[in-house]
Amino acid sequence: MRYIRLCIISLLATLPLAVHASPQPLEQIKLSESQLSGRVGMIEMDLASGRTLTAWRADERFPMMSTFKVVLCGAVLARVDAGDEQLERKIHYRQQDLVDYSPVSEKHLADGMTVGELCAAAITMSDNSAANLLLATVGGPAGLTAFLRQIGDNVTRLDRWETELNEALPGDARDTTTPASMAATLRKLLTSQRLSARSQRQLLQWMVDDRVAGPLIRSVLPAGWFIADKTGASKRGARGIVALLGPNNKAERIVVIYLRDTPASMAERNQQIAGIGAALIEHWQR
């Protein structure tokens, strides 16, 4: 009997851990939900294989907010690859085309901006008018949603333009995704043949150059680690980030974190996302 018991213990020791068996990150997420009095959705996915490493509420809907801009520029690059668009094409616009928070596009009313410059502004500075101008080139919210369906994402949906899409009403399915769907879509854009290798590199570089994500995962990133990301925010209790991370300056994993329905301040939301990121990184380094 003792021999059988030892054999069973030895066998169990060789079995792989379950997908959700990352205790430290999940404990941090539960703590964050308690401190935020809201919901957290998260997924950590291996970039090469697509395997889920850690997940929490990964199939629940969360507002995309400005994280949609990565998918938007992916759709733009798909049109470039198909010969239907050029990054060098200049787009001219008027004062009435500008919406709240347009730090780059508001400076180019006289000369306009190229499609590539608009993508850079939308991702690196989260410029809302740049996003709307690009959204018009892909057929608006319905056109971007159609692109998502074409690449196999049957969950993510965009219904409105900037800045209304950031409304984040409780229970509202408009302009939402799930952590699992967003991670899978990001992986398709960056690793599959949905985009050319050149377009994949360009999309990733725009995320590397993100200049408005400092208080989140970048604030806890160890020296020598790679990060490329895009954040999103709402005045109504939501916050989010999509990121690629890895040691040795190499992208190895996709991390998607969304918050919703929290009364916490923006600084507190940032701190909680940074804490979740730190827990993931610490667990990774073990």
UniProtKB/Swiss-Prot annotation:
It catalyses: a beta-lactam + H2O = a substituted beta-amino acid. The active site is at S66 (acyl-ester intermediate), E164 (proton acceptor). GO terms for molecular function: beta-lactamase activity. It is an enzyme of class 3 (hydrolase). One of its GO terms (biological process) is response to antibiotic. Substrate binds at K230, T231, G232. Pfam families: Beta-lactamase2. Disulfide bonds join C73-C119. Its EC number is 3.5.2.6. Residues 1-21 form the signal peptide. Keywords: Antibiotic resistance, Disulfide bond, Hydrolase, Plasmid, Signal. The class A beta-lactamase family has a specific amino-acid numbering system, sometimes called Ambler or ABL numbering and often misspelt as Amber. A multiple sequence alignment was used to derive a consensus sequence and then the consensus was numbered taking into account insertions and deletions. This allows use of identical numbers, e.g. for active site residues, despite differences in protein length. UniProt always uses natural numbering of residues, hence there appear to be differences in numbering between this entry and some papers. Belongs to the class-A beta-lactamase family. SHV enzymes hydrolyze broad spectrum cephalosporins notably cefotaxime and ceftazidime. SHV-5 causes particularly high levels of resistance to aztreonam and ceftazidime. This is Beta-lactamase SHV-5. It comes from Klebsiella pneumoniae.
